[in-house]
UniProtKB/Swiss-Prot annotation:
UniProt protein name: THO complex subunit 5 homolog
Keywords recorded for this protein, A-Z: Cytoplasm, Differentiation, mRNA processing, mRNA splicing, mRNA transport, Nucleus, RNA-binding, Transport
Chain intervals with Basic and acidic residues compositional bias: 22-32, 296-305
PANTHER family for this protein: FMS INTERACTING PROTEIN (PTHR13375), THO COMPLEX SUBUNIT 5 HOMOLOG (PTHR13375:SF3)
UniProt xrefs under InterPro entries: THO_Thoc5 (IPR019163)
Molecular-function GO term, any one: mRNA binding
Compartmental location: Nucleus; Nucleus speckle; Cytoplasm
Subunit note: Component of the THO subcomplex, which is composed of thoc1, thoc2, thoc3, thoc5, thoc6 and thoc7. Component of the transcription/export (TREX) complex at least composed of alyref/thoc4, ddx39b, sarnp/cip29, chtop and the THO subcomplex.
Function: Component of the THO subcomplex of the TREX complex which is thought to couple mRNA transcription, processing and nuclear export, and which specifically associates with spliced mRNA and not with unspliced pre-mRNA. Plays a key structural role in the oligomerization of the THO-ddx39b complex.
Pfam families, A to Z: FmiP_Thoc5 (PF09766)
An example Gene Ontology CC term for this record: nuclear speck
Length: 684
């Protein structure tokens, strides 16, 4: 652009109306105030869509004018020519229009924001009002709940029903014409009737007490009369001894045994009577005998506690008399006190339980006089030699044979709470240290002898002979069942150690005719070895294992696959199902925690007890579990997808089992359920 053109444009840019600057500024401000006001009024009547259309048209016209000016300048027209000036004026008008549209847009935006802010304030006010109402409702509900929960003292009194009240109560108390309409008066009338009844029953109670005293006096008189018959009966029995010898009748033996039984302590006597009665009535293979020194038992004429106190007094007198005698050390005194506290009664009781196969369970019951508890020792006699199975060494161990005969009854601690304070005096930390010498103080042994302590007194109201009789039959059945189950396990372990899983003919239908996977190893392990296995940690955390359980390790193999099974056999087997935990060594190491199909195999073995129990009482449960484990391993390997390495040839595990579906669900579970007699596998 030339300097002449600049000089020509200057007067146009600074050109303005005449007047001083102050006058022009004041006039401009007044005109702008009017324009702003007019534009606000005008904004109410304008359509935003039309303004948007006008904006696009103005922009298009402005672009067209700019292009025309560009063409004119390109064609050689001068900057101040009439055509360029005309288009420049038109462009200025369009710029003014755009500015106006911009102002209107900003005004609309401000107006919209103001309206939004006002609406938001109204919403906030309504929300606060709603919250206040909700708080008031919650407060009223709490107050209503307090009112509804209020209980008057008369509500704790058990009243007769309204029908019985109107039927039995006299009219002066019931007043049906008033109480049937007024609930409050009805409640008062029922309370009056209850008071009247209780007064009448109190009088009847006094009358019953007086009659009870009369009956007790009559009973005492009859007892005295029956006691006077004892000498005569004894003479008759002595006179009949030659007849008993001639007829070979056991009355004399029974009489002698009864004479010895008189010197038994009360708990052993209760057990002797109840066990003998049960043997005569229900179990002919049960025999009871009394063992020990009768003369020493006769010498115990005073209670153990009194004799112990007298002995301590006599020892003190001897020490005072023999002052020159050397006093024993503290350790020796404690040992003597421990021996005295743990002293057994001279007489003990023996019970022999015979089984059909000729095996005998010998039970020896001892009474600890100062502790007031019974202990038991066991011994098993079998008709055949059972020394073949190495893993069955703990099955017939006398120390663990009767563990958990009842649930959680380990027999390592005394059930008498008072013994804890007695142990503290003589420095005994735990009774378990003396169990091997004295026997196990099982809770069921105490109940068989009629002993009941405060720890379990709340569970039973029986005591003495009634308590013993209530537990005798069940305990004897459990003892015989424990012996049978351990003998069956001993026989099964002998086969398992030779890699043979014995399956009886009654259980053959539970498995297919051909099971390729086989047991290759069966060994016993300790609790410490079990806890060190990585794939059983979830079982330990769940508390499903205790130190009294029996632990075994089974290895099942097929080809290159090797399945490890940690087996936990509860002492109450087969009542409690053995627990299997699995780990598969094949193409890496897998366990039930990482492989859903191994977890399903564990479920097949651990959960479905009813299918594997076999004939009652379920002594074949463990071997059936192992056989099912071998069957499930076959299904697992045969249905597992083979990863091709590019080589041709037969698969390692050809499919021999018929399956409806090889996998199901997102976890791709395999069909482990065997369906007999169809012979195919399906999902559960």
């Amino acid at each position: 652009m030339s300097s002449d053109a600049v000089k020509k444009r200057k007067p146009k840019v600074i050109r303005s109306e005449a007047g001083t600057p102050e006058t022009k500024r004041g006039r401009a401000e007044s005109e702008q105030d009017v324009r702003v006001y007019n534009e606000e009024v005008e904004l109410e009547g304008r359509d935003p869509q039309q303004d948007y259309t006008l904006y696009k048209e103005t922009c298009a016209a402005l672009a067209k004018l700019m292009s025309e000016i560009q063409e004119l300048k390109t064609s050689g027209a001068k900057d101040g020519s009439a055509e360029i000036e005309l288009r420049r004026k038109q462009s200025s008008i369009h710029f003014i229009t755009l500015k106006k549209l911009n102002r209107l847009a900003h005004m609309r935006l401000k107006k919209g924001r103001d309206q939004t802010h006002e609406a938001k304030q109204r919403v906030d006010v309504l929300h606060l009002q709603l919250q206040n109402l909700l708080y008031e409702v919650m407060h009223l509900q709490k107050e209503i709940g307090k009112c509804l929960e209020f209980k008057s003292q008369h509500e704790e009194i058990e009243l007769v029903s309204e029908d019985e009240f109107f039927q039995d109560a006299p009219a002066e108390i019931s007043r049906p014409q008033v109480t049937r309409e007024d609930h409050h008066q009805l409640t008062l009338a029922r309370l009056d009737w209850e008071l009247d009844q209780r007064k009448r029953l109190a009088e009847q109670y006094k009358t019953s007490l007086s009659s009870k005293e009369k009956i007790q006096k009559a009973i005492e008189q009859k007892r005295e009369y029956l006691s006077s018959l004892q000498p005569g009966l004894h003479n008759i029995m002595q006179a009949s001894l030659p007849v008993q010898e001639y007829l070979s009748m056991p009355f004399e033996h029974m009489q002698k045994q009864a004479e010895v039984a008189r010197h038994l302590p009360p708990p052993l006597y209760v057990l002797f009577v109840q066990a003998g009665a049960y043997g005569q009535a229900c179990d002919k293979n049960l025999t009871v005998s009394i063992r020990g020194d009768v003369d020493e038992a006769k010498a115990l004429s005073r209670p153990p506690e009194d004799s112990q106190d007298d002995e301590s007094d006599s020892d003190a007198e001897e020490e005072q008399q023999n002052t020159k005698r050397r006093r024993p050390t503290v350790g020796v005194q404690l040992d003597d006190k421990r021996k005295e506290m743990l002293r057994r009664h001279p007489l003990s009781l023996g019970i022999d339980l015979k089984c059909k196969d000729g095996s005998v369970l010998h039970l020896y019951f001892y009474y600890l006089m100062n502790l007031n508890i019974l202990t038991v020792k066991t011994k098993v006699s079998t008709s055949v030699d059972l020394s073949g199975a190495i893993s069955a060494g703990e099955l017939l161990n006398s120390e663990s044979l009767l563990n958990c005969l009842y649930a959680s009854d380990h027999g390592n601690e005394t059930p008498n709470p008072a013994n804890r304070y007695q142990f503290d005096k003589v420095g005994i930390t735990t009774f378990a240290d003396y169990v091997s010498d004295l026997g196990h103080p099982y809770v069921w042994v105490q109940k068989l002898s009629g002993l009941q302590f405060s720890s379990d007194a709340a569970q039973s109201e029986l005591s003495g002979s009634a308590l013993s009789a209530s537990h005798m039959e069940k305990s004897m059945k459990l003892l015989r069942g424990r012996l049978q189950s351990r003998l069956a396990l001993h026989k099964q372990f002998s086969s398992l150690e030779h890699s043979i899983v014995p399956v009886s003919s009654e259980c053959q239908h539970l498995f297919p005719a051909k099971v390729v996977s086989g047991l290759t190893r069966w060994t016993m392990m300790s609790h410490q070895e079990f806890t060190e296995l990585s794939f059983v940690q979830h079982v330990l955390k769940a508390g499903l294992v205790s130190e009294t359980d029996l632990f075994f390790k089974a290895v099942v193999e097929r080809g290159t696959a090797r399945l490890l099974a940690a087996v936990v056999v509860n002492p109450r087997y087969p009542e409690v199902t053995p627990l299997f935990s699995l780990s598969l060594l094949w193409k890496g190491e897998r366990s039930g925690r990482t492989d859903d199909n191994l977890r399903a195999m564990e479920s097949e073995v651990n959960v479905f007890r009813a299918e594997l129990q076999g004939p009652r009482p379920g002594l074949q449960l463990l071997t059936n579990q192992i056989q099912r484990l071998c069957m499930c391993l076959d299904v697992y390997l045969e249905t597992e997808s083979q990863v091709s390495d590019g080589s041709e040839g037969p698969k390692e595990f050809p499919r021999e089992k018929m399956c409806l579906r090889t996998a199901r669900g997102p976890s791709r579970l395999k069909p482990f359920k065997y369906n007999h007699p169809q012979g195919f596998f399906s999902h559960r």
